[in-house]
Amino acid sequence: MTLKRGIMLIGFLGACTMLVSAFAGELEISGTPGSPSATTTIDGKQLPPPPDDHFGGKIERSVLDSTPYWPPGVVPPKGAPNVLLIMTDDAGYGVSSTFGGVIPTPNMDRIADTGLRYTHFHSTAVCSPTRAALITGRNHHRVGSGIIPELSNGYPGYNSLMTKDNATIARILKENGYVTSWFGKNHNTPDHTISRIGPFDQWPTGLGFEYFYGFMGGDTSQWQPGNLYRDTTQIHPYDDDPDFNLITAMADEAIDYMHNIDALNPDQPFFIYYAPGATHAPHHPTPEWIEKISEMHLFDEGWHKLRETIFSNQKKLGVI
């Protein structure tokens, strides 16, 4: 599979500017105007864009004298990049080798070496506020996420409600013609809305993400995730698979999603928010990873020596 325009966001702000600025320009219609095949881009001056309820056809007394009309579908501008936004859980600034840690993350290193390392993103001590800020570009209090949903209350900034006037990245990109999805942890939906009957407006599918495969809440078992959902339907794939592992299944789901896009429309840009939760308790690494990390002897010299090593690495990288 060839995925064109590939881009990974280690930080979001710079890429957001690039995407939004790319949408500026005159509106042009491709395909036959008024037909279902007609497409256009939007200029990005107003996000989200105003609804287009203009009817460009003609209605007369007979069908023969009338002209049907479909409004043009919105597509991203030519060359719009794919966007993969990855957020790890409970992994500190000095964990990955990309930021001076001793845990080898060679693919992230490669991307960072040819791109940018963002070093000034504000991260809170609990994850929900940071997640809300990341997917909206706003201070977490502005999107009701001053605390985790389990401790939310009825006061402004702390009710865990993202209102319609605070659009997520996914909603903005979807309305610019992207396909959007969320894989992994969702710790931004209020507890009282997590049920089989919703309401679902605060779930990923109600926040601009067209597809969701992941778990609701702060943590889950990697072997038997009882809070696993596909869109808004609870699923139990581990019932028929004793070897089921969520972090592996999640990666497979995301890869299948990209394969499907490429098979149906290779020119269709996508936005994927990928939020694994395996580094959050409960810690359930697979035997293969336990063996792999153990053989590296990364922590044999103890905490103080490890701290000195990470500090030295980060000074060399210039990230502190």
Q: Where are the language model's segments positioned?
A:
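Bacterial N-terminal signal peptides that target proteins for export
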Residues: 1-10
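Compositionally biased non-globular segments, especially hydrophobic aliphatic-rich helices
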Residues: 5, 18-20
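Bacterial N-terminal signal peptides
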Residues: 10-18
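Boundary at the C-terminal end of the N-terminal hydrophobic targeting segment
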Residues: 22-26
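N-terminal module-boundary/linker segments of secreted carbohydrate-active enzymes
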Residues: 30-36, 55-56
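Formylglycine-dependent sulfatase
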Residues: 40-320
